A protein has these predicted regions:
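A gly/proline- and charged-residue-enriched helix-loop-helix capping module
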Residues: 91-130
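N-terminal small/glycine-rich loop or linker at the start of catalytic domains
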Residues: 14-45, 75-90, 96-102, 138-175, ...
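Generic structural hydrophobic/aromatic packing signal, biased to beta-strands
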Residues: 10, 20, 69, 96, ...
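Active-site loop segments of alpha/beta catalytic cores
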Residues: 116-343
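Short, glycine- and charge-enriched coil/turn segments that flank and shape catalytic ligand pockets
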Residues: 1, 39-40, 102-112, 172, ...
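N-terminal basic, low-complexity leaders that serve as flexible interaction/assembly modules and, when applicable
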Residues: 1-90, 225, 309, 329-343
Length: 343
């Protein structure tokens, strides 16, 4: 894949125009996705059908001019493999029937076995069969902290009060759980690479719940352990790693470490200031506010070209959203965004 704009950017090689992909590019805003989704009462059942996942991953590739595909799956597959009882029902977010509510629940967890997630690895293989040979596939996982937050809370939440209380009352038990998740994430990502992904992204979707100090203690140190293991492993050592931290309270420049190829910026982050601070030492991905896609074509053009002009001379720039695309977006607005970034 020597001619991949996306992989070139991750190696800090200049491109004539920035490579483009976007978070949740296969998803609910696409009518063709909805046609398949209506056949499943539980989203997770759909994720467990590799051929269906491959079709869904290809939908945005067939519709738009994109430079990378991302595996169609969910970040919560690891807690589900730990027997926490994950389910997604129409109109609801994720729910766990067996959440972590006390330290003893961690001691009685079943051992993580990546083979229970063979449906994910089969989805990688099926997706690679359908993708153009020159188009990279991104694999991913949630960060240990983000997976722990969902697992303790029992699902999504506005304030994650149960998780914060658990962190305050049982920090040692939480660290034990984070170690389990850390090892599981490494093994999970390693198997994705063996199955054919070309790059990896770690989503710390609940980084914003933590103070700057707690982010280092409960999140970053475990993310670093994952990347260190990946970079020490002959199977995965050459695979680029992207980190997405959602609106962290730490400076972004303090979140960059040697094993990362790319930092993916939340839309609230100042991409101009950050690009000047890191001085071409790491690829930067982002960071259009997804809400801009609800605006007029003129405003979309202005915002996209503002970001692209800031990053014009930055060799490792990947155009993306600063968070996942929302279900209400008209696909034609995505087309406008891509056209603006290509000019």
């Amino acid at each position: 894949m020597n001619d991949s704009k996306f992989l070139n950017a991750l190696e800090l090689k200049p491109n004539s125009t920035p490579p483009i992909w976007f978070m949740r590019q296969a998803g609910r805003y696409l009518p063709e996705y909805q046609e398949i989704r209506k056949n499943y009462s539980n989203f997770l059942d759909m994720c467990k059908e590799p051929k269906t996942c491959a079709k869904l991953a290809l939908q945005p590739i067939e519709r738009f001019d994109l430079d990378a595909s991302i595996l169609f799956s969910d970040i919560l597959t690891i807690p589900d493999a730990l027997n926490l009882g994950l389910a997604f029902h129409e109109g609801e977010g994720p729910k766990f029937s067996n959440p972590i509510s006390k330290p003893e629940d961690i001691n009685t967890l079943i051992s993580f076995d990546e083979n229970t997630l063979s449906y994910v690895f089969n989805a990688v293989e099926e997706t690679k069969k359908l993708l153009p040979a020159d188009l990279p596939l991104i694999g991913f996982c949630g960060s240990p902290w983000t997976l722990a937050a969902y697992s303790i809370e029992g699902g999504g939440s506005k304030d994650f009060k149960k998780t914060k209380n658990f962190m305050q009352d049982h920090p040692s038990a939480l660290h034990d759980f984070l170690e389990i998740l850390c090892d599981a994430c490494y093994r999970y990502l390693r198997q994705q690479v063996l199955s054919g992904v070309n790059a990896l992204q770690i989503f710390d979707s609940w980084a914003d719940l933590l103070s700057a100090q707690d982010l280092e203690i409960f999140s970053l140190q475990y993310t670093k352990k994952i990347t260190q293991k990946l970079k020490s492993d002959p199977i995965t050592k050459n695979i680029p790693i992207i980190l997405f931290e959602k609106d962290p309270k730490q400076k972004i420049t303090d979140l960059i470490f040697d094993d990362l190829s790319c930092i993916s910026l939340h839309w609230k982050n100042d991409i101009e200031a950050i690009s000047k601070s890191v001085k071409n030492n790491i690829a930067i991905q982002g960071n259009l506010n997804p809400m801009i896609l609800s605006e007029s074509d003129e405003i979309i053009y202005q915002e996209v070209q503002r970001i692209c002009s800031i990053m014009f001379e930055y060799p490792g720039f990947i155009f993306n959203l600063g968070h996942g695309i929302t279900p209400d977006i008209n696909p034609q607005k995505v087309q406008t965004m891509i056209k603006a970034a290509r000019e």
